[in-house]
Amino acid sequence: MVDPSGDPGERGAAGHTVLIAGATSAAGVAVAVALAGAGARVLAVGSNEKRLERVLEAVPECSVYVCDLTDFAAVTALAATVHAEHGPVDGLVHLVGGWRGGGGLDGQTDEDWDFLHTRVLQTLRNTTRAFNADLLASFTGRLAIVSSVSVDAPTPGGANYASAKAAAETWTRAVGHGFAKAGDTAAAVIFAVRSLEGLEPRLAAEVVALWDSPAASLNNTRRILAP
């Protein structure tokens, strides 16, 4: 039985149900492989069925779901399906993202902002709202997102992107404050990178390690991953 103190003890990620939102990227596949290797039940979610097949090739034992994570009704339906098939989740790893930018401040178009706001922030809002009760109910609930160091030093050409990531970090910290008010069993963690390319294995290892430490030592921390 998992320790209700929020300390996973020696079990780590084993036996936990972890949903990866945006699982079809290289980072998503790496995280899925690492979690499955650690004994977790992996639920891979993406918007493209063909790309989800690649996740299944890498992790045959995982369960895959096609969902438009920008649509809250679709996400709540996903949550209902997940609960019916697997019960509540213990972890949510949000990897939905994308890049739009360049051209200085004048190049920060409304179209690019809408794209970034929808993918980076709206999908995070939707998934955390749909699965927040699960993470609070779990003795070892974990939320992880990937942000950018550009939040710390934004440039005119990356203003849209940095703003969307900053908003995602703020949302995540708000979720973390909710976790803290409810007790010491759930944690929200931000991983910040300059570029995720080449860091996928490192990110995967860091995500798995979230179940190796007590929630109180992890909650609302921000970790910079560098090459």
Model-derived segments and spans:
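C-terminal helical subdomain
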Residues: 177-227
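Conserved glycine-rich Rossmann-like NAD(P)H-binding loop of the short-chain dehydrogenase/reductase
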Residues: 38-54
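Conserved NAD(P)H cofactor-binding loop of Rossmann-fold oxidoreductase domains
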Residues: 95-102
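Hydrophobic positions on the long internal alpha-helix
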Residues: 78, 93, 123-131, 135, ...
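Conserved glycine-rich cofactor-binding loop
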Residues: 24-26
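Rossmann-fold cofactor-recognition segment
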Residues: 58-73
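Flexible N-terminal pre-Rossmann segment of NAD(P)-dependent oxidoreductases
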Residues: 1-20, 215-217
